[in-house]
């Protein structure tokens, strides 16, 4: 196994003051990219997740620098020293006005690339937000057998990335899943689920249940399989893209040790580990240091392989 890379993204979204006024939305079907600026000269990725920017602009929100000058959001990020953006993509968010669908992703990725910024694509594999408390299958994927679920993951991944390629955008990183501490693509049937541990009925069924007692069984083998077909789909389109497996609670050494030991044991593939930390919501109490313990432990382990 090649040496593992590690990445901790502290996405500091440095939005300035908003003011409401009309604004034209960028056409996602616009032509190819103009000449790009050279990427910012640095080996350190300093980025922000600004996936909501097109929706904000559509609602008339504007962005300003510290001098009060109205500035394009992407340009503002670059002016603040950022050299990368993370952009999420959902499968079919029609109930959310199609924000963060493939076309919207391409629109934003082109704007970032035009400024010489690196792009990370964040696949949620859901029709809306996926996180440890909700890893719901896209509506169109419900009822699929395991083989067809894998094909759906691979097909969606490749389709989105091919759309970026057609637009002249080459992502540097691709996340296969978002905050998948609890797995992805949950199902009541453990044979079809990608849960990493047993999940409550109220989480699997969402608003259709309030039961916290019934738990649906984990299937880490399926989770590894879903990650792997996503990984392979990424490499089939962008062979040099860095594939990230992303968890939250970056301070939790035991979580990362358990998760990636299980993923390795089930044949999982990844190039980089993505860690999220949320100081605003988390009482760190020096936990920021423990996130380094896993990276140190795992790096030592990889060096010994």
Which positions does each model-derived feature cover?
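Substrate-binding cleft and catalytic face of glycoside hydrolase catalytic domains
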Residues: 76-199, 215-219, 224-234
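Short, acidic/polar
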Residues: 63-77, 157-160, 254-263
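Bacterial Sec-dependent N-terminal signal peptides
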Residues: 17-38
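Single conserved hydrophobic/aromatic residue that forms the stacking wall/gate
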Residues: 294-305
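Aromatic- and acid-rich polysaccharide-binding/catalytic face
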Residues: 258-287
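Aromatic-lined carbohydrate-recognition surfaces of secreted/lumenal glycan-active proteins
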Residues: 172-178, 227-254, 304
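Distinct, well-ordered alpha-helical segments
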Residues: 59, 132-133, 186-189, 251-266
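Boundary/entry segment of secreted carbohydrate-active catalytic domains
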Residues: 34-70
């Amino acid at each position: 196994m090649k040496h593992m890379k590690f990445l901790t993204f502290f996405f500091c979204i440095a939005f300035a003051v908003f003011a409401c006024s009309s604004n034209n939305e960028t056409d996602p079907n616009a032509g190819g990219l103009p000449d790009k600026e050279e990427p910012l000269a640095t080996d350190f990725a300093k980025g922000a997740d600004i996936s909501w920017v097109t929706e904000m602009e559509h609602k008339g929100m504007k962005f300003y620098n510290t001098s009060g000058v109205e500035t394009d959001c992407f340009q503002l990020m670059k002016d603040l020293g950022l050299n990368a953006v993370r952009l999420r993509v959902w499968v079919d968010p029609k109930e959310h006005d199609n924000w963060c669908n493939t076309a919207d992703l391409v629109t934003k990725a082109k704007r970032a690339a035009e400024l010489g910024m690196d792009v990370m694509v964040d696949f949620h594999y859901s029709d809306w937000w996926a996180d440890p408390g909700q890893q719901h299958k896209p509506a169109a994927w419900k009822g699929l057998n395991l083989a067809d679920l894998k094909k759906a993951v691979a097909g969606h991944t490749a389709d989105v990335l091919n759309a970026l390629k057609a637009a002249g955008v080459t992502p540097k990183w691709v996340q296969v899943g978002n905050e998948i501490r609890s797995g992805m693509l949950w199902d009541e049937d453990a044979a079809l689920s990608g849960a990493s541990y047993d999940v409550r009925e109220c989480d699997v069924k969402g608003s259709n249940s309030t039961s916290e007692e019934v738990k649906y069984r984990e299937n880490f083998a399926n989770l590894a399989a879903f990650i792997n077909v996503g990984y392979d789909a990424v490499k089939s389109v962008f062979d040099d893209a860095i594939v990230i497996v992303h968890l939250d609670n970056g301070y939790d050494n035991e979580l990362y040790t358990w998760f990636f030991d299980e993923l390795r044991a089930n044949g999982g593939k990844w190039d980089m580990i993505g860690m999220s930390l949320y100081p605003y919501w988390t009482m760190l109490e020096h936990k920021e240091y423990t996130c380094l313990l896993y990276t140190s432990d795992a790096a030592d382990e990889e060096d010994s392989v």
